[in-house]
């Protein structure tokens, strides 16, 4: 099968590489390309107008991301083509003597004088629909002014968060990228980063539900790419922002974040430096009820009041050097430092339901838990781009990456029991009289976790336009090697040892995991006419995983090879409508922390573990979407995912009331969804409305698992709705008032049922200093409705219920000030797809 794939891929690449560019026989088509006169890069969003000798408009178009445009006309005799883009001097080309077909490349010159004196009042649309993705420009989004990156993501079409706070797209897990490169963070680390990152630092969010073969196949739901702001034109530019929040639920506390972005572009260099820092205290009240025993006759109620804090710093420095007219050398360095900690005194009551009439409590447990974590990440990228032929956008890009992550965590738990009922006291007396251990003797533990991860990656990409710039071929190869080292130690504590003293070493576990991934891909797109275009791709990935559980003398790992096809088909019957159909086959590789077999305690009776034998999950994805009037999108989709492992499997011991969450290939999940996205619909000149609405039908069927103590032969279907809406009123004197909110109905997440929740927010903002400064006041979660409830059912018995009251309601004040010109074009750099699974 591997030989067959390589043969097919080589045939595709060879045929495409030797396909000679030629003029299209359709005499109604004019094609060309627009570039920056200084960098030579293709310019996007250039307005191209074809005018006759009387200056009447004959045809118009806009350049794509590579600077290419297509015009249609019956004749070019006596016509001129005019080019315009904000920040550049206008240009025009006479078509006298030019035959219908390809127009020579046009270079636009930056208009430095205009940028220094003019006030630019235009804005990009909130949503832009590209060939294979939706782009959300967040500059006008109310939540971006004072909110964090999580608030901004909630406004993106199809984006939701699961019960553990992980990002999902259309109900499926996604790979999260930052500036065209994977985030290099585990689930909790990414959550902390997004909550602490200022929304004003974000330029756009790309929602790629069906990535092409150029991207890694990782991510069942696709890719969400968060792009931050950068500078473009000559000179010094940048921005500063600060945001403070005051929250009073469940207790009064404050949070804050700030960012600084600086950029300088000279004749041959482009330098960017950014810093983001945040401190995010939080309070959480969690009540958990678990039924256990014969016929679930006993109840364990746990009340957990915790306080904690996330804090961190991110620094990024990038440098591009134009070493010749066709060669660019670049480097990127990033540092991410973050830490967290919490302290949680816990009280548990154990009730005997057989004595429920008098509600006599059996016993109680007073528990104290605390945890501190720290993560340091360092990454570096060196990239090189060579342009062979600007008129064909023919270029070669090489990326070499290295990432190092170090994470340390320490956990403390102390549990003290008290016999409250005569029955409990009698049990204790009987045990002591028989010379047995006191069943109500306290216990506890200290544990420490050490993790190191190193990733090396090399990627080569080649691309060029074909067929008079109406087609494009992309091909490339990639190799990635990663090694993670995990060490875990547990120390047992028993009274009368002082609570702050660490006990004796009771367990030691060492787990090492390595992975090699080798990939080849080819991708071809073609515009067959002004109405029809298509894209097909094929990617092959060969994976060599190795796991070594040293303390158990246990090894795991099985090589596997997969082929991932994808197909896109677009039909544009008119300028007001687009119909798209796409199919993709993708996988979810196990995250490194999902493979870790160490036991991590949530509380004395609940813990989670990984599985070193966890296998990848695979998904088929089919999507049909339509776009009307550029701002209304209707989408229907279906996915079938086997070896589903996105949520942990609950292994519930009904006799003891203990609950183990284990990562496992749980079963098969099928999902069908309908989505509507309405972007900035004008009700009046001063009132706009934005709406994202999603309906999902989910069916989960568990694989038979003889190791489960409950929930065998489990299957469940559910329907759910989620949505986001905002309305903005544009007031005089550059004031704006906005109301926005999001909500979701109950939804099935594997074995669990997540209750519905919603939130309503309001903001009032003022722009000044010619629009360079903005001050925004915002009220979050006005009705205190953003609480998460979770339940677990065995048949018609609710065996577990959790109510999480987390601090969300509050008021925030944010300020931003920008200086400089505009936004920088991004180059094809970075190859850390696999490091998003750290």
Give the predicted meaning of each segment.
Residues 509-513, 587-636, 640, 659-673, ...:
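Outer-membrane beta-barrel signature, preferentially recognizing the C-terminal barrel domain
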Residues 227-242, 284-290, 301, 311-318, ...:
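Surface-exposed extracellular loop regions of Gram-negative outer-membrane beta-barrel proteins
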Residues 155, 182-209:
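Short acidic/polar hinge/loop motifs at secondary-structure boundaries
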Residues 35-39, 47-51, 82-88, 100-142, ...:
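Short, acidic, small-residue-rich periplasmic hinge/interaction motif at the N-terminus
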Residues 316-338, 364-548, 572, 576, ...:
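Face-selective signature of the C-terminal outer-membrane beta-barrel domain
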Residues 303, 455-459, 502-509, 633-692, ...:
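Outer membrane beta-barrel strand-and-loop segments of large Gram-negative receptors
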Residues 202, 217-224, 232-286, 310-313:
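Outer-membrane beta-barrel translocator/receptor signature
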